[in-house]
A protein has these predicted regions:
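Conserved catalytic alpha/beta core of Sir2/sirtuin-type deacylases, generalized to analogous enzyme cores
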Residues: 1-327
Length: 327
């Protein structure tokens, strides 16, 4: 039997190639013209492409309504904000809570409202309607499961950075992941959240909720009784389980199959935090395939190397609004 590391690894292979490409780019960058022409060009590129590779970052989920600050945070984390001074969901994930009961109460909410509820805007569904007739594949750094919720084929998805819906053991010898849905639902009930008319947890009318879960609800590994943690890539302890490696291999095979085809590399909401996973590899693949095109839709961060300017489409704007114009 082959080990995980003998398999074709689309994740690391593309990162290495992308980094090699950036060394030749320098500061030569192409910025978009904010005109309707770019949207017409993208519509034409979609219609004439043989395949579409979607690279999705946090900006896509933000466009769909998954904001980590503002109204959503104020509604569901008002008590944590008041007591601990936490400003948003992202920074709260790093807060040194006083005990495990409080820390896991936070994470139960964080997971639930960013993984087990549906996005407030149909951006993912409209994206699927746009590309579902194409031969497509999705690579994403998002961990909120929204592609599958919208109906994308799970065999065409590669979640590189983990999944809010999975735990992993702190025992490094254990390279498995564990579904956390049942635990999350129990932990939400334990804090006093109630189901609304849509069957989703919400704040009760009296706004009385707890910032702690019972000690008996602190999650433990069913296999080795070790402490559990989130299956999110933060360091080299991140568990790349069998499903992760299978998805990486499918990504590798898809890219190889379409290496010389009329492929559209469609980048959505990828910021500066993780360009090595999607942005740089996409630039590499377009640079090395004269039949390919690169498209980038992002709010305030839409650009491409001058080397592929003639085959690049950069749109500065809200992803959801742009998709509506493309359908």
């Amino acid at each position: 039997m082959r080990s995980f590391y003998d398999k074709k690894d689309g994740y690391r292979d593309t990162i290495q190639k992308g980094l090699a490409t950036t060394r030749n780019i320098g500061n030569s960058i192409y910025f978009p013209d904010k005109s309707k022409e770019e949207i017409d060009m993208l519509k034409n590129a979609l219609e004439n492409s043989d395949s579409v590779v979607i690279g999705a970052g946090a900006g896509l989920s933000t466009s769909a309504g998954f904001t980590y600050s503002g109204e959503r945070f104020d509604r569901y984390f008002f008590d944590f904000a008041r007591k601990y001074g936490i400003k948003d969901m992202y920074s709260g994930g790093f807060y040194p809570f006083p005990d495990d009961e409080t820390r896991w109460a936070w994470w139960a909410r964080h997971i639930y409202f960013n993984r087990y509820v549906k996005a407030s805007k149909p951006v993912y569904e409209e994206l699927l309607a746009l590309i579902e007739v194409k031969d497509y594949f999705v690579i994403t750094t998002n961990v909120d499961h929204q592609f599958q919720k919208a109906g994308f084929d799970k065999n065409r998805l590669f979640y590189t950075q983990g999944d809010y819906g999975l735990f992993q053991s702190l025992n490094k010898r254990n390279q498995k992941t564990y579904d956390n849905e049942k635990w999350v639902m129990k932990a939400m009930e334990a804090q006093g959240f109630v189901k609304n008319e849509n069957g989703e947890f919400d704040i009760p009318q009296d706004r009385k909720i707890s910032m702690r879960i019972p000690s008996g609800l602190i999650p433990r590994c069913i296999d080795d009784n070790s402490d559990l943690t989130m299956n999110l890539r933060a360091d080299n302890s991140f568990v790349e389980d069998e499903g992760w490696h299978a998805a990486s291999e499918r990504y590798y095979d898809f890219l190889k199959e379409h290496k010389h085809s009329k492929a559209l590399y469609l980048e959505l909401g990828v910021g500066a935090n993780t360009p090595v996973i999607i942005k740089y590899p996409f630039w590499h693949m377009v640079s090395n395939n004269k039949n390919a095109k690169y498209a980038c839709i992002n709010y305030g961060e839409s650009f491409a190397p001058m080397q592929i300017e003639d085959r690049s489409i950069c749109i500065d704007g809200d992803i959801g609004e742009v998709i509506k114009k493309l359908i």
